[in-house]
Amino acid sequence: MIKIYDTMTRSLRKFVPLTENTVNMYVCGPTVYNYIHIGNARSAVAFDTIRRYFEYTGYQVNYISNFTDVDDKIIKAATQAGVSPKELSDRFIAAFIEDTKALGVKPATQNPRVMDYIAEIISFVESLIEKDFAYEADGDVYFRVEKSEHYAKLANKTLSELEVGASGRTDAETALKENPLDFALWKSAKAGEVSWDSPWGFGRPGWHIECSVMATEILGDTIDIHGGGADLEFPHHTNEIAQSEAKTGKTFANYWMHNGFVTVDNEKMSKSLGNFVTVHEMLQTVDGQVLRFFLATQQYRKPINFTEKAIHDAEINLKYLKNTLQQPLTETADEQELKQFVIAFQDAMDDDFNTANGITVVFDMAKWINSGSYTEPVKSAFEKMLAVFGIIFEEEVLEVDIEALIAKRQEARANRDFATADAIRDQLAAQGIKLLDTKDGVRWLRD
């Protein structure tokens, strides 16, 4: 039984899907104006792992993750680069797909783009105005937060608490608002900006409305899980809830999940602090699976500290798991012990997708395998566990028949033909195969 920590209720809750054996997930994707950094990648990897575990347990997952392809940051970066916002966003969407593929992230069921949903966004805003949840002011449209019952319930704050923090704002946009907390659903166009015609004049969508529209258009008024980084809890997800539930009158998402930050020297990795490294840069020197494994070593809600040592440790541990998978099969293994490993793994992952505990089970199982318990069922179970973490090793085509050469070497040794035996060992070593002579016979692994 899978239990999820739901940010809305601040509690572990049994997962009950809206539709039996199906999970509908929406995860906020990147604003595509630059390469993603390791902190951004954590969200992609964390929710991919969650998706994979749902699939491991037999669920069909509809996994939707958007691309924000129109935004203030995109417009600014496109202007600086001398290209259109679409050209810039297309470039970095391609880069995102390439980077996350290297991290073993499965393609989403759909990756909706904001620019493809402008008509639906306008219709959504019109509906909110009709219901008196929104109002037009000088070409902008704002959401009335005071009309939203339990606004900011996700952030566990009251409207009065938030109003205190907003009371000192004096910018031009705030002057148009009925309440400083009211947020933009539609922004009037500025000279030279990308824009679309609407009942309120030329403009473009506000950030928060985009995800509400794409999520409900694709998955319906209520979805099972909405996810994203912890920094999206307020205001982004808070505003999504307010506008979505105002329009439909229904619960927007049954479970809210938020991943923790990647930190550097215990500070959040971010572009604004300048303490970030992009995935694109890291992949020049570090294998994508190593980065993936590093990001999986901590339970998704907890922060994870990025250090060279942590990456080095991930590389060593990944190599150990690969060598374990490449052990020769044995004839027997304790079926009950195998069953216990599978149960322990599921218990760990059922507990809010605790990858740290799940990986501990994987290494305990690897130790057991390396002690001589590696039948085909054991191998299959082990590979399925690793696949949950996105660890999938492709079968390498050998130029030699390893087992045949080992048998030939054993025969040479029995005949005291040590020159031939040594030559075979050298031949295997050239193929990256290391031989281990044990009291139970010869074992081999890839070096």
Curated annotation (Swiss-Prot):
Catalytic activity: tRNA(Cys) + L-cysteine + ATP = L-cysteinyl-tRNA(Cys) + AMP + diphosphate
Stored SUPFAM superfamilies: Anticodon-binding domain of a subclass of class I aminoacyl-tRNA synthetases (SSF47323), Nucleotidylyl transferase (SSF52374)
Cofactor descriptive note: Binds 1 zinc ion per subunit.
Enzyme class: ligase
GO terms for biological process, alphabetical: cysteinyl-tRNA aminoacylation
Cofactor section: Zn(2+)
Cell compartment(s), UniProt: Cytoplasm
Enzyme Commission number, as recorded: 6.1.1.16
Cysteine disulfide links: none
Gene3D superfamilies per the UniProt record, alphabetical: Anticodon-binding domain of a subclass of class I aminoacyl-tRNA synthetases (1.20.120.640), HUPs (3.40.50.620)
NCBIfam families reported in the protein's UniProt record: cysS
Record note on quaternary structure: Monomer.
UniProt protein name: Cysteine--tRNA ligase
